[in-house]
Amino acid sequence: MTERLFLDDSSLREAQATVLRADASGIVLDRTPFYARSGGQPGDSGVLRWDGNEAVITETVKGESDAILHLASTAALPAPGTQVLAVLDWPRRHALMRMHTALHLLCSLLPGAAVTGGQIGADRSRLDFDLPDPPFKEALEDGFRSLIAAAHPITTEWVDEAVLDSNPGLVRTLSVQPPRGTGRLRLVRIGEAPPGKLVDLQPCGGTHVANTAEIGAIKVLKIENKGRQNRRIALALGA
């Protein structure tokens, strides 16, 4: 099993780790700041450094037995037991964090609309919603500006799975359900807990910024009809 350091600290840019396995299937570390591809968020890229050597990591994916596989494009691999420094491609990761949090804000701007699909990218992202009528682009952009300017804090907490059973409305996605079986779930909260200050709360295992101001400007690229009640909203990070 690989300890997922990003679950408790998404701002971590690098970390020391020990190699458990390294072969053609990937490099497995005992702990990592690299996010493994899942839930529509791409896996991280970066480098592993050790003893004057470097392995370029082009993708990170989930392996068996809760392992995370760091896929290297270089032939030289660190031997098991080697101490490495795992360093993220931070500009790319930070863009993905900004995008992911922006998509949670988008959910908050469309209360009650279930998410039917989505994809997160460093340059462009989108969510599909079960909506009878498309929202107005200007209204969404105004909503983004207000929420981002407010610098709402983003926090995470671990709760018992029973919380989800008693609050099924926390899950906004129809196509993907939060992983179950460990007995606990990670919630991502935007805003404060008191009534009127909570912006969004939903199960999520992805990486996020520390507050909404860190997102920066968001552009609504387009809103498309993808079926009788399916509306696709595409976003991009602004300058």
Sequence positions of predicted segments:
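Active-/binding-site microenvironments in catalytic and ligand-binding cores
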Residues: 1-239
